[in-house]
């Protein structure tokens, strides 16, 4: 199958602003705000523990979105939120890879422990391989990036282990790596074209700037995953009309 970049980009918009897509925007957004608040709390605790001259840490305002909890609680919260983000990522991939408009019970219960474990390991492995490729030369890094683009999708959608997912992603990308690179670059450039103006329009470090950038980044993350899963469906020949999986009877109606 040949990847159609335009179709992936437009379908990504449609899926992002569907009922399920907007639900994921909300879930990702809430999780990101919780994570930012936990990290800001850790930063405040770290700065407070430093032996700095009086007034050295004083600023025009306190750290935005920090929590009135201890550093230990904030650290635990950050880890829990990261795990929750990974789980939401898995459910999103399953819903969009099946081309569903609703979130079914099966998408968030099916072998979730196994899939989460392999997803985390895959993120580390793919990240390291891509980083090594970029350190050696830029081209090998890009080659690895597009070749392993669907590893996380195979793990979430097909319940595969890390090695099988890497192998299948490599095979699926074969023959379409240039098109996949173009797709990644378009999304990457679009991401910065939309988010970069916020640095000029809103006060740096303000709560408003933090909220606006987090909301925008959340929408763009969901869009990116929608585009990748659409490309996955295209290359697997699952993008034909009526080819998507029908919602099962246990649909949650979200």
Describe each model-derived feature in a short phrase.
Residues 1-163, 167, 171, 175-254:
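Hydrophobic alpha-helical membrane segments
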């Amino acid at each position: 199958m040949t990847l159609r970049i335009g179709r992936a980009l437009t379908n990504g918009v449609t899926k992002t602003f569907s009922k399920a897509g907007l639900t994921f925007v909300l879930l990702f957004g809430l999780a990101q705000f919780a994570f930012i608040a936990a990290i800001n709390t850790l930063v405040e605790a770290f700065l407070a523990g430093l032996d700095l001259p009086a007034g050295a840490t004083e600023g025009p305002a306190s750290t935005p979105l920090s929590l009135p909890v201890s550093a230990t609680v904030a650290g635990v919260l950050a880890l829990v939120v990261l795990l929750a983000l990974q789980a939401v990522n898995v459910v999103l991939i399953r819903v969009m890879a099946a081309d569903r408009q609703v979130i079914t019970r099966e998408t968030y219960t099916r072998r979730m422990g196994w899939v989460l474990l392999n997803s985390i390991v895959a993120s580390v492995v793919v990240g390291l391989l891509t980083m090594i490729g970029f350190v050696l030369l830029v081209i090998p890094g890009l080659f690895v990036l597009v070749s392993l683009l669907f590893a996380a999708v195979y793990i979430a959608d097909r319940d595969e282990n890390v090695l099988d997912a890497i192998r299948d992603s490599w095979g699926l990308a074969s023959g379409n790596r240039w098109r996949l690179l173009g797709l990644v670059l378009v999304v990457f450039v679009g991401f910065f074209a939309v988010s970069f103006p916020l640095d000029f329009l809103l006060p740096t470090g303000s709560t408003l700037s933090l909220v606006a950038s987090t909301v925008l980044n959340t929408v763009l993350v969901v869009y990116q995953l929608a585009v990748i899963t659409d490309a996955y469906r295209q290359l697997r020949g699952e993008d034909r009309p009526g080819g998507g999986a029908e919602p099962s009877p246990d649909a949650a109606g979200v």
